[in-house]
UniProtKB/Swiss-Prot annotation:
It comes from the Bacteria. Keywords: Ribonucleoprotein, Ribosomal protein. The gene is rplQ. PROSITE patterns: RIBOSOMAL_L17. Belongs to the bacterial ribosomal protein bL17 family. This is Large ribosomal subunit protein bL17. HAMAP family: Ribosomal_bL17 (MF_01368). SUPFAM superfamilies: Prokaryotic ribosomal protein L17 (SSF64263). GO terms for cellular component: cytosolic large ribosomal subunit. It comes from Clostridium perfringens (strain 13 / Type A). GO terms for biological process: translation. InterPro entries: Ribosomal_bL17, Ribosomal_bL17_CS, Ribosomal_bL17_sf.
Length: 113
């Protein structure tokens, strides 16, 4: 079945977690998280970057509706999006770090290319 991963949470918690992960990712340029969370975060972050490349007011408002910090949105539109002006998708890279010590979950580093 196509769509999205449930990540073992109710819808509102999952959306809040992914919004926070995307905001942190765009703020810092990289995050360390589990592989499944990173795959969902990657998908949403790439959509935000593609919107930012459009650069119009409507795109800015759409990004503001998802990303939780205005400074991150400003940085996304002013610095990150112009860097990828010539690139069509594939703005992120994932590195496997290995299993997490506590529960053995596969951990990855997600970063901007």
């Amino acid at each position: 079945m196509a769509g999205y991963r449930k990540l073992g949470r109710p819808t509102d918690q999952r959306k809040a977690m992914l919004r926070n992960l995307v905001t942190s990712f765009l703020k810092h340029g990289k995050i360390e998280t589990t592989e499944t969370r990173a795959k969902e975060t990657r998908s949403l972050a790439e959509k935000m970057i593609t919107l930012a490349k459009r650069g119009d007011l409507h795109a800015r408002r759409q990004v503001l509706a998802f990303v939780t910090e205005e400074e991150v949105v400003k940085n996304l539109f002013d610095n990150i999006a112009p860097k990828y002006a010539e690139r069509n998708g594939g703005y992120t890279r994932m590195y496997k770090v290995g299993p997490r010590r506590g529960d053995g979950a596969e951990v990855v580093i997600l970063e901007l290319v």
